[in-house]
């Protein structure tokens, strides 16, 4: 079957922003203007197509990333048809995993900013995630019709926090006087017709704003010229570049992520300017414009795959979702080749082959069956049972392993138990399914209490997951109070720590002996787990016993010596050992390593780590002093205070997570409901002695 749309006319984009900046509203308008939807769905009515989960419709927020496809020929229908695959992502920090895995597979992103709120905390988080995966992006300023909207203040915040913005449009008016934009490429004013819900528009000469528009156009042309020395010389000589040159070189700078933003603005809810957002065709890359994807072959040699149907098949599974009608959907991004329904693929991580049942094309939670997927496609596959998020699928005859995705560690935990015996088995199935879909969610059984412990990225994250168990699996559950995900580590280096397992009780003995050294690993923002090195010289311990040593330490990492919390940031070097020809075994060396690691932790001045959160509070100025005082009383360190576009203050602080439970109620009371806050995990830090002792006592039941 021939490709319907050339890959050069594909755009795989995500729409991301801070919560309530207008991502989903923007996506709904795009679907309307491209003819996918014949009616605009509103978030506040619970009718948005992309917010299809019941919890999303009730709460008016996006919880899970939703994918859809539309086709676009330009505002004036002058372009060949382009295919745009869109992923609408959540804005709440508790669901940051959805943004993370979407960024991994996208070719470009549209960042939506509120013209009133400016660059808000989650906007910066998403920007860093896009930087991590080198995703080219455009910025769009939304809500220009709102009281307090300030286009220039927002761009100033972008410049201070994100990079140098380069406008490609200029606003005509603001707040209730916002009428349209001036296209700085064509130097034409675009005025949208509200009666047709923005479907119709007209070009006008921007006479009244000509001087301001020319100033911004000069800045845009200069930004394009900076991409190339020859181009800059020509610009300096003539003072002008052609429209095609400007577009081409701006696109190149966006593609190279040179901290340049080509952005439009609009008011999505009032249907003004959303069509201009489809400037993604002009400025964001197709799959063939980005570098080939990197990986390793079955000999662990570096290899690449170009975005071409002629290459061997390769894809990345970036999301799992359970559908009540067809079972597990595995969302894949195809980087190269063609795959048809019924074909067999190879998973190099698991070392297993699997057969594809069929493919579907998603529109939020609606499905249309398709026969095949090609390079550049994003689509769910049905029938895969062994795969997990972040793993590679490839041609069994041409193996490649793509770079895996790294997921954040949970920072909050709760005990959960079924209300009735009938719910017991169903709860186990539900938790297993949810954990399979969401890599930032963990579930374990506490060995001492027998309780089931669920862990996630925040209170809302766990609340939504428990609600899902009830709605989707019919499981009624009681939930305990939130608990902080503490960690343990060591402060100093210890050498020559003995670990010995020696039992003789008649018959074959049980002997293993290791000598290890332990070091503290440097930590940046996230705990790094541990490194293990074998530094044994000579034949004092056979090589077959090294993996059991590693396994023994791995198991002991789950339970530290202070309070039983997981141990992180530790490097272990094995530099001596002894064995017995008859009595030694893998199990004995595993036990010896566990004993040695435990003893090493005790000697290495162990300490408890607690998660620190980056907190931003938006408050009227009258309450700013009280807010800062309250944050300080919670062991918080106030790190700065900025003015909000509409007045008031944004207070930035770093606060231990353990001090933030119930903060929303306190803040609401303190500010008469006028202040809001957001919070995200920042890093782990050593807990003060009194906090560590209190935490240890609680775990030990004192």
Curated annotation (Swiss-Prot):
Q: Which UniProt keywords apply?
A: Cytoplasm, Elongation factor, GTP-binding, Nucleotide-binding, Protein biosynthesis
In which compartments does the protein localize?
Answer: Cytoplasm
Ranges of residues in domain tr-type G:
8-196
- Chief location category: cytoplasm
| Taxonomic superkingdom | Bacteria
Which InterPro entries does the protein's record reference?
EFG_II (IPR041095), EFG_III (IPR009022), EFG_III/V (IPR035647), EFG_IV (IPR047872), EFG_V (IPR035649), EFG_V-like (IPR000640), EFTu-like_2 (IPR004161), G_TR_CS (IPR031157)
Which terms under GO biological process does the entry name? ribosome disassembly
Residue numbers binding GTP? 17-24, 88-92, 142-145
The GO terms describing molecular function are: GTP binding; GTPase activity; guanosine tetraphosphate binding; translation elongation factor activity
| GO CC, one annotated term | cytoplasm
| Keyword set includes Repressor | no
Please name the HAMAP family in this protein's record: EF_G_EF_2_B (MF_00054_B)
UniProt record similarity statement: Belongs to the TRAFAC class translation factor GTPase superfamily. Classic translation factor GTPase family. EF-G/EF-2 subfamily.
The UniProt function text for this chain reads: Catalyzes the GTP-dependent ribosomal translocation step during translation elongation. During this step, the ribosome changes from the pre-translocational (PRE) to the post-translocational (POST) state as the newly formed A-site-bound peptidyl-tRNA and P-site-bound deacylated tRNA move to the P and E sites, respectively. Catalyzes the coordinated movement of the two tRNA molecules, the mRNA and conformational changes in the ribosome.
Protein name per the record: Elongation factor G
Name its species. Thiomonas delicata (Thiomonas cuprina)
Q: Which gene encodes it?
A: fusA
């Amino acid at each position: 079957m021939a490709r319907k749309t050339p890959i050069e006319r594909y755009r795989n984009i995500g729409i991301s922003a801070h919560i309530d900046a207008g991502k989903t509203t923007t996506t709904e308008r795009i679907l309307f203007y491209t003819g996918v939807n014949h009616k605009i769905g509103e978030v506040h009515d619970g009718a948005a197509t992309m917010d299809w989960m019941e919890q999303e419709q009730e709460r008016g927020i996006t919880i899970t990333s939703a994918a859809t496809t539309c086709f676009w020929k330009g505002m004036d229908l002058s372009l060949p048809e382009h295919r745009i695959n869109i992923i609408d992502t959540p804005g709440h920090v508790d669901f940051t995993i959805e943004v993370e895995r979407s960024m991994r597979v996208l070719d470009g992103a549209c960042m939506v900013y509120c013209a009133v709120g400016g660059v808000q905390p989650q906007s910066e988080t998403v920007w860093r995630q896009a930087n991590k995966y080198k995703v080219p992006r455009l910025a769009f300023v939304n809500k220009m019709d709102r009281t307090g909207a300030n286009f220039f203040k927002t761009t100033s915040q972008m410049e201070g926090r994100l990079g140098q913005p380069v406008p490609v449009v200029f606003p005509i008016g603001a707040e209730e006087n916002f009428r349209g934009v001036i296209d700085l490429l064509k130097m034409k004013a675009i005025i949208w017709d509200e009666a047709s819900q923005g479907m119709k528009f007209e070009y006008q000469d921007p006479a009244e704003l000509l001087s301001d528009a020319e100033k911004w156009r000069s800045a845009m042309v200069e930004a394009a010229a900076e991409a190339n020395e020859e181009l800059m010389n020509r610009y300096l000589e003539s003072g002008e570049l052609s429209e095609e040159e400007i577009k081409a070189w701006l696109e190149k700078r966006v593609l190279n992520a040179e901290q340049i933003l080509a952005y439009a603005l609009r008011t999505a809810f009032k249907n003004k300017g959303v069509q201009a957002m489809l400037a993604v065709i002009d400025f964001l890359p197709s799959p063939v414009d980005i570098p080939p994807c990197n990986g390793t072959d079955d000999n662990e040699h570096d290899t690449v795959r170009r975005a071409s149907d002629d290459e061997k098949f390769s894809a990345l599974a970036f999301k799992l979702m359970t559908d009540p009608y067809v079972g597990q959907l595995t969302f894949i991004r195809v980087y190269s080749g063609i795959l048809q329904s019924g074909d067999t693929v190879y998973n190099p991580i698991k070392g297993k082959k699997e057969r594809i049942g069929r493919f579907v094309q998603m529109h939020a939670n609606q499905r249309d069956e398709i026969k095949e997927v090609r390079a550049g496609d994003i689509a769910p596959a049905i029938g895969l049972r062994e795969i997990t998020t972040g793993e590679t699928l490839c041609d069994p005859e041409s193996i490649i392993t793509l770079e895996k995705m790294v997921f954040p560690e949970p920072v909050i935990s709760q005990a959960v138990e079924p209300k009735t015996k009938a719910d017991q088995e169903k709860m186990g199935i539900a938790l297993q399914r949810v954990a399979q879909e969401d890599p930032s969610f963990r579930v374990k059984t506490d060995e001492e209490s027998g309780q089931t412990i669920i862990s996630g990225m925040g209170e809302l994250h766990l609340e939504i997951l428990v609600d899902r168990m009830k709605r989707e699996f019919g499981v009624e559950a009681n939930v305990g109070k939130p608990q902080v995900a503490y960690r343990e580590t060591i402060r100093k280096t210890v050498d020559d720590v003995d670990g010995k397992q020696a039992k003789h009780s008649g018959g074959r003995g049980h002997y293993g002996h290791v000598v290890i050294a332990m070091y503290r690993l440097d930590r940046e923002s996230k705990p790094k787990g541990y490194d293990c090195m074998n530094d044994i010289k000579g034949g004092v311990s056979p090589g077959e016993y090294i993996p059991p040593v590693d396994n023994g330490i791995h198991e002991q990492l789950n339970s530290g010596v202070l309070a039983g919390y997981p141990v992180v940031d530790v490097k272990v070097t094995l530099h001596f050992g002894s064995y017995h020809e008859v009595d030694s075994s893998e199990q004995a060396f595993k036990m010896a390593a566990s004993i040695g690691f435990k003893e090493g932790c005790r000697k290495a001045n162990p300490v408890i780590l607690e998660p620190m959160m980056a907190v931003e509070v938006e408050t009227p100025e009258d309450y700013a002093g009280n807010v800062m005082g309250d944050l300080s009383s919670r062991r918080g360190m106030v790190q700065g205070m900025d003015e909000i576009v509409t007045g008031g203050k944004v207070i930035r602080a770093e606060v231990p997570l353990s001090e933030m439970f119930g903060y929303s109620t306190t803040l609401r009371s303190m500010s008469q409901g006028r202040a809001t806050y957001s919070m995200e995990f920042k890093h782990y830090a050593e807990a003060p002695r009194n906090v560590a002792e209190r935490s240890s006592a609680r775990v030990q039941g004192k």
